[in-house]
Amino acid sequence: MPKMKTHSGAKKRFKLTGSGKLKRQQANRRHYLEHKPSTLTRRLAADKTVSPADAKNIKKMLGI
């Protein structure tokens, strides 16, 4: 059997923490920021953890 390939889109978007959870960045902070409040853009700068419902599929994409 050949080796499984990691999903290249997933490996760019998700990072594994030391405890085994997955980190992701939040949406809506790429462009059109001039009409968004500064409080919103600061809040969106923080990373979030992936929900457990999605984590199983993402880990499969990453080959973990």
From Swiss-Prot:
Family annotation (InterPro entries): Ribosomal_bL35 (IPR001706), Ribosomal_bL35-like (IPR021137), Ribosomal_bL35_CS (IPR018265), Ribosomal_bL35_sf (IPR037229)
HAMAP family reported in the protein's UniProt record: Ribosomal_bL35 (MF_00514)
Keyword Transferase: no
Protein family (similarity comment): Belongs to the bacterial ribosomal protein bL35 family.
One term of GO molecular function: structural constituent of ribosome
Keywords: Ribonucleoprotein, Ribosomal protein
Species for this entry: Renibacterium salmoninarum (strain ATCC 33209 / DSM 20767 / JCM 11484 / NBRC 15589 / NCIMB 2235)
Top-level taxonomic group: Bacteria
A biological process term (GO) from this entry: translation
Ranges that cross the membrane: none
Statement: the UniProt record of this protein carries the keyword Ribonucleoprotein: yes
Location of the region described as Disordered in the Swiss-Prot/TrEMBL record: 1-28
Entry protein name: Large ribosomal subunit protein bL35
Coiled-coil spans in chain: none
GO cellular component: a single term: cytosolic large ribosomal subunit
